[in-house]
Amino acid sequence: MSRPHGYSKATMDRISREYNQVAKKINTGRTNRLQDQTIIFNLSESFANPNRVPGVSLKANPIPKIDHIKKETTSGIMISSGYGGGTADMEYMTLTGFAMCNFAQTLSTPYTQLVPYLKHNPTIVQSFKYATAIHPYSKKFYDRGTDYPKFGFKSFFYLGSKKHPIKHQQKIDRNTYLSDQTAYANTLDQLKSHHGAQFINLVTMQNHLPYNNLYNGINRYRATVGDGTDPAQVENYAMGIHYTDTAVTQFIKEIDKLNRPITLVFYGDHLPGIYRNSMKKDGLKLHETDYFIYSNTAAQRQGAKKLTRSTHYVGPNDFIAMAAEQTNSRVTPYQAMLTQLYHQLPAYALSTQQNGTNSFNSAPEYINQQGKVVSYSSLTKQQKKLWHDYQLVQYDITAGHHYLLKTNMMK
């Protein structure tokens, strides 16, 4: 990452003092603590409604239940920094709040190129006394087995683990990956076995590529597609997210039965790479995934409320601030900065004119609440200052002298 202009100990001390004050102001109106909540970040592999893709239409809607949930709670479009890949990058951004578009072009996968080599990796995990990761697949991909302990996770449930095995293993028809129902059953086990507050990072696998001859009955989602796109792949994919639709809805019913505050942040990491649209023409649409943030009945009794501002278009970096705001939880100075970024800046991502599948990064692209790309030059002076402060913080923690670790900025 390039050294931002003005980087120095004095500058970072100024940033720490300033966002301490921002945090104090925000926390005046907050009554809860994150560490008393159970927050689940659920990365849903390749989840995005095909009906948003130009030239694609399906005979039926594969995700009616999730669409209904989205109408009832905080929800919108997440701008992904990948197409057809880049899962670990979206996961990294949600957990740290840092942006891929701030890194050097050659740093395309922080999980393998950065995290293992840093002594300190501040994440949302450190706001909790207990944290668990669940991934119904191998721990080897993207060095998760190395990175999760560095992030502060106490346990990691994965396929092949003897200490923390994946149970309730089910597959659907000819899909070789474990189902989303499997993922949620293991998450429910964790919620029931650890009775206190906790953070859970759940990464599913069911809808991972390939999308050939996976399911029976795909005719119910018969697809009309553009030139070059294989309708059978779209139909198989649609059937997969139909099963996700059912599994998520059932999981929400189960967490509503638990008498403690639980908030689920559900998001698709990227679209499946099955659409042969022009990236130059349709790039933004090919980087739009679905997200929602659902707080169970117990959380609502404690003051959790649907967010109504800045929710239409967000980035993975926004979920820490959004989860804290929805649960009315107090924030650290760094989380206060993320809160300002969420409310005051457009969503930001790598260029949506490229695939962005763990290859090379690009300059930031900004997308406003109307879903339009806006230029950096259109930002106000205050917005540019906030963006520069953010770059300084990311540089200090990941490539600089770690001045902020000697302050309470990240605590």
Regions from the PLM with identified roles:
Residues M1-F41:
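Membrane-interface segments at or immediately adjacent to transmembrane helices
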Residues K24-R30, S44, N49-K411:
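Solvent-exposed soluble domains appended to multi-pass membrane proteins
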